[in-house]
Amino acid sequence: MKEIYFGGGCFWGIEKYFQLIKGVKKTSVGYLNSRIRNPSYEQVCSGYTNAVEAVKVEYEEKEISLSELIEALFEVIDPTIRNRQGNDIGTQYRTGIYWTDSSDEKIINDKFLKLQKNYSKPIVTENKKVENYYLAEEYHQDYLKKNPNGYCHIKFD
């Protein structure tokens, strides 16, 4: 089982989206690469922590590759916009792919180079090592399962 972390705006929709993908075995939402230990949602929203709202995705490599997961992410984000997705604006909503296995860095870089041809503006999605990851509060976990009519910048129709 491998793990990768995705930032793509509000983590509620990104989590639901990846839960629907074959080969993804487990997800959680949290705050990634924070300046402070165990930040609260309010602290993250203030911008002080510089944390990203992120989804930890655990997946079976025999069923889906990292390259395919990146393509899936790019289906629901605009990788050319910094600190915003949909109506969500702030540094916590920046897009990124974050890794714990250093061999993933090259896969991500290579994929960005291939995908760049699809965009007239440069891709600004981050490709960085996970420095820390703190689980978000319980009410954020599986939010759109618990609240099917909740706000989401991703359309699931």
From Swiss-Prot:
This is Peptide methionine sulfoxide reductase MsrA. Disruption phenotype: Decreased agglutination to sheep erythrocytes and survival in hamster lungs and increased sensitivity to hydrogen peroxide. The active site is at C10. Gene3D superfamilies: Peptide methionine sulphoxide reductase MsrA. GO terms for cellular component: cytoplasm. One of its GO terms (biological process) is cellular response to oxidative stress. Keywords: Oxidoreductase. Has an important function as a repair enzyme for proteins that have been inactivated by oxidation. Catalyzes the reversible oxidation-reduction of methionine sulfoxide in proteins to methionine. It catalyses: L-methionyl-[protein] + [thioredoxin]-disulfide + H2O = L-methionyl-(S)-S-oxide-[protein] + [thioredoxin]-dithiol; [thioredoxin]-disulfide + L-methionine + H2O = L-methionine (S)-S-oxide + [thioredoxin]-dithiol. InterPro entries: Met_Sox_Rdtase_MsrA_dom, Met_Sox_Rdtase_MsrA_sf, MsrA_MetSO_reductase.
